[in-house]
Structure formats: structure tokens, C-alpha cells
């Protein structure tokens, strides 16, 4: 065993932990199909949101960790449940009245309200695929509609008929009495209306491969369960899909947690081994509510990328997948700065075990680019933007180049992008919410002391020396908690309750410019 493999096996990073579970489930052997299958799922009822991206990003992290631990081939599929019947019209789509006329129809049988694709389902699938492609995910796309109609599930659907009683025995205890009377794992597609029907099944025949039900007019209808004439209810569908495709690893959100046992048991009833599973926590919006594709109450991938690099979004996905996290625009600056810190630590670290534990290793699948920001963070750029209100990033570069003469847009592309992002973020989220504190007489005395301290400093002084001078003034200012001292300074000078290390900010903004800013407040 190589030292690299030993270090990977010892790693406690969650993608490696998941990869080890998969390898253990296979007893270290290649499956009969010749590869390990990773599956992600997508419900195309609404526009893809950042959680959809997150599931795929996390899945690839585990896939790449598994490839590090073994020589077994892998494959990632993205499965779209586009044959589901429409149950609710999303609030964030055009032509909702038109779509409302197709309730209970498969998503791929509803006209595209955006007027671009063959159907509503095809449009949503295209949106998903476009951003998965944009970020370089290597995957195969599976459509539920195509799989059912092409007969790819036929063998398992016949097996569901053969195991009908056993599956019903598993499912019925999970329902209320009124639902028990009407439930069947099969949902026929009505030959007349094309709707996905949830109706009682009066007869089933495994040899003929058919089910019999009564339609809304009371007419007895017999249909085959194969070739797309029926689909399964979502819980049996999950387990059937695992069995048919021989899935080895699946992730799902906490809303599936209670049903994970059912999916697994159905897979076993159908004669296959269920996959290793990871249940991740759901993202919450600014009000602490679950984000939803149909509500559109979250950040889209495009939203995030308007204000920050993709690596920061991937870091947000990496961190604590089993813990609920609030996902709104105010998490962006923190994740950008944390990414910068992790990137710098990775390239300074010689211990491979610690490198394997660093999030950037998994974000970049072991090929981590080295970025240079010369100690300038996203938060610092936001504060600089706050005081100089630039029309474009060239204004910020005037300050940056004076702070660090080696830094230029052409040799610091990452920092150049951050400057552009910071201006956008400030204009859209910070500017309108700034609230300045009018300085009291006590505050004015403190500001005068800081001004006097700055007057005697050369422009070449280190940021740490400036920070110490401000700290010393605070120690003499009579505050019980120095945090309140700095909070007051931030509110007076920057119009916000928190901010950067003032020594670094003053060094970047300039001593003479800071003196003018203080004089304005006096």
C-alpha cells in the first residue's frame, strides 16, 4: 500500500469517510456491472436551485475520494423525475394559468411555459444540464420518462407485480386509514387524458404484466405496467430505481430521511442490495424556512456567481453537509474569505494528511490552484468600497497597488475578480443598509486621539503597528469590553456594526485618506 493511499484511508474528511463506507460495502471488489454507480436525483417541478448544484458537487467529492481509495471505475448519473405528475404550479414561472390547465400531467407532457423547449420537463432538464455542464461535472443524464417508455425498468416493474403483496405490506402501515383504501404502488397513465392517476388497483397479473383499475367515469381499464403505461409512486420508484440500475451510492435531503428505510427495503424485496446513503441537512432561507424550487425563495447559482467565485459556493457545500445551514446573500463574503484562508493553508502545509483534510483538496479534487491576494480579503474590499464608493474596479486597484506595489490585475486575476465582485455586492446589499452612528463627545475625543496618532506615522508603516496604536487608544478609552469600542468605530466610520482589522484597512485605504475620513466625522 502506498503512503498516499495510507494517508487517504486515515483521513477523517467526510468525503473519504463516505468513500470508505462504499468500499466496505463492496468488500473492496468491483461490482458485476464493472463500475461503482453514484446517483443524484432531480425533481424538475421548478427551476434548479443551489441545493441541486450542492448535491452534485458533494457527490463528485465522494466519487473522487472513492477513486483515490480504489482502482474501481465509477460512473455518476443525474436522474430526473420528469414523469411525475404536476401537483402544484410554481409561483416563479411565466404563464402559470396555462400550466394550471395541465395538473396531474407528466412534466414532459406539459407545454413549456417559457416557450423554448418541447415541454415543461424538457425545459427544466435543460436548465439543470446547462449548469452541471458549466461547472465541468462528468455525468450521464437519465430521464424518468425516457427510461420508463424505453422499457429500461420493465423487468423490475414485472418484479414489483410479482412482489405486490409484500410491497403493500411494507407500505400500508405508513399511511392513514383513508389513504390505505386507495393506495397502490402503481400509477397508471390515463389513456384518455394522459394524466398520472392515483387510483385503487382492483386486479394485477404478473404473468400478463397488467393492472386493472376504474377511471373517473367508472369504466374498467386494463393497462400494461411496462413501456411507460404506468409509473411507480415515488417511494417504490426510489427503491425500484436503485434495484434496476444497481446504484451503489446515493445522497438525499433530510426530507427523505424517514423514507430511506422504505427505499432500501423495497430494493431488497426486488432482489438487490440498497446503496450506501448519506442524508444531508436542508438549506434554510433568511427566515429559517426550507428553500424550495417552486417558491424560488433561495439564491440561484447565477446569483451567487454574480458576487463571488464558484470556489466559495463549493466551500459552502462542502462544510458540514449533515448540519442545517442558513443560505442567503449574507453568507457569501464569509465563504469567500474562508476559501482564501483554506487555499493559503493548503499550499503552506507539507503534511499530506492535513492536506487531505483541507476542504480545498475536495473542492478541486486534489488539483488545487494557488491564488494570491496579498493579504487582501473580500471583506476588506467591501469596506474599502464602502468608503470610496468606486464607479469601477480601477478605483480599488489604485488603493491596492499602493498597498502592495507587486499586485496588478494581470498577475493577480483572482484579486481582480474579487474587486469586481465586491463593488457589485456593496451596491446591491450593503449600500442601502448603512447606518452611521453620530459621534458623541466621548467618541470625538477618541477620534481625535486616533487622528493625532496617525499624523505622526510614515506611509510605509506596517498595518500591525497601526492596529496596535488603535488598540492602545481603546484600552485607555474606558470601555468594559473592547469589542464595543471597535463596534463604535465601525459604525461611525463605515456605517456598519462590524468590520476588518482597522490597521489593515487604514494601510489599504491610506493614512492621509483615513485622516480625512475622521476629520469629516469630527
UniProtKB/Swiss-Prot annotation:
Keyword presence, Cytoplasm: yes
Main location: cytoplasm
Species of the source: Rickettsia bellii (strain RML369-C)
Gene: lysS
Binding-site residues, ATP: 293
Region forming the signal peptide: none
Name of protein: Lysine--tRNA ligase
Enzyme class: ligase
Superkingdom assignment: Bacteria
Any Pfam family hit: tRNA-synt_1f
Localization of this protein: Cytoplasm
Organism ancestry: Bacteria, Pseudomonadati, Pseudomonadota, Alphaproteobacteria, Rickettsiales
Amino acid at each position: 500500500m502506498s503512503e498516499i493511499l495510507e494517508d487517504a484511508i486515515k483521513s477523517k474528511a467526510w468525503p473519504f469517510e463516505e468513500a470508505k463506507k462504499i468500499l466496505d460495502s463492496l468488500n473492496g471488489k468491483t461490482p458485476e456491472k464493472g463500475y461503482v454507480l453514484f446517483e443524484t436525483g432531480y425533481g424538475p417541478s421548478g427551476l434548479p436551485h443551489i441545493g441541486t448544484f450542492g448535491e452534485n458537487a458533494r457527490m463528485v467529492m465522494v466519487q473522487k475520494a472513492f477513486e483515490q481509495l480504489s482502482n474501481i471505475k465509477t460512473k455518476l448519473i443525474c436522474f430526473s423525475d420528469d414523469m411525475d405528475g404536476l401537483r402544484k404550479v410554481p409561483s416563479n414561472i411565466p404563464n402559470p394559468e396555462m400550466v394550471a390547465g395541465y395538473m396531474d400531467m407528466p412534466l414532459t407532457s406539459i407545454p413549456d411555459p417559457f416557450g423554448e423547449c418541447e415541454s415543461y420537463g424538457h425545459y427544466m432538464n435543460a436548465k439543470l444540464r446547462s449548469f452541471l455542464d458549466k461547472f465541468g461535472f462528468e455525468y450521464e443524464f437519465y430521464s424518468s420518462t425516457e427510461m420508463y417508455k424505453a422499457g429500461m425498468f420493465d423487468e423490475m416493474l414485472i418484479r414489483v407485480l410479482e412482489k405486490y403483496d409484500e410491497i403493500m405490506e411494507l407500505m400500508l402501515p405508513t399511511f392513514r386509514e383513508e389513504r390505505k383504501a386507495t393506495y397502490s404502488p402503481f400509477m397508471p397513465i390515463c389513456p384518455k387524458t394522459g394524466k398520472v392517476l392515483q387510483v385503487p388497483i382492483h386486479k394485477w397479473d404478473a404473468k400478463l404484466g397488467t393492472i386493472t383499475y376504474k377511471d373517473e367515469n367508472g369504466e374498467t381499464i386494463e393497462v400494461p405496467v411496462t413501456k411507460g403505461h404506468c409509473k411507480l409512486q415515488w417511494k417504490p420508484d426510489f427503491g425500484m430505481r436503485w434495484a434496476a440500475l444497481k446504484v451503489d451510492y446515493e445522497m438525499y435531503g433530510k426530507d427523505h430521511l424517514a423514507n430511506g428505510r422504505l427505499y432500501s427495503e423495497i430494493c431488497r424485496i426486488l432482489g438487490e442490495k440498497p446503496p450506501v446513503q448519506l442524508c444531508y441537512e436542508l438549506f434554510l432561507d433568511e427566515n429559517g424556512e426550507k428553500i424550495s424550487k417552486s417558491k424560488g425563495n433561495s439564491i440561484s447559482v447565477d446569483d451567487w456567481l454574480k458576487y463571488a467565485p464558484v470556489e466559495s459556493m463549493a466551500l459552502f457545500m462542502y462544510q458540514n453537509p449533515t448540519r442545517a445551514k442558513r443560505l442567503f446573500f449574507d453568507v457569501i463574503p464569509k465563504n469567500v474569505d474562508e476559501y482564501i484562508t483554506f487555499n493559503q493553508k493548503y499550499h503552506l502545509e507539507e503534511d499530506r494528511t492535513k492536506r487531505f483534510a483541507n476542504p480545498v483538496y475536495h473542492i478541486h479534487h486534489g488539483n488545487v490552484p494557488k491564488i494570491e491576494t496579498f493579504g487582501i480579503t473580500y471583506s476588506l474590499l467591501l469596506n474599502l468600497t464602502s468608503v470610496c464608493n468606486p464607479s469601477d474596479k480601477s478605483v480599488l486597484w489604485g488603493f491596492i497597488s499602493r498597498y502592495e506595489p507587486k499586485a496588478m490585475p494581470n498577475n493577480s486575476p483572482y484579486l481582480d475578480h474579487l474587486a469586481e465582485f465586491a463593488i457589485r455586492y456593496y451596491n446591491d446589499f450593503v449600500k442601502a443598509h448603512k447606518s452611521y452612528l453620530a459621534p458623541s463627545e466621548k467618541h470625538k475625543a477618541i477620534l481625535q486621539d486616533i487622528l493625532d496618532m496617525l499624523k505622526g506615522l510614515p506611509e510605509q508603516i506596517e498595518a500591525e503597528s497601526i492596529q496596535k496604536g488603535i488598540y492602545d487608544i481603546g484600552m485607555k478609552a474606558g470601555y468594559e469590553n473592547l469589542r464595543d469600542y471597535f463596534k463604535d468605530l465601525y459604525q461611525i466610520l463605515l456605517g456598519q456594526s462590524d468590520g476588518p482589522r482597522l490597521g489593515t484597512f487604514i494601510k489599504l485605504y491610506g493614512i492621509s485618506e483615513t485622516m480625512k475620513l475622521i476629520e469629516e466625522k469630527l
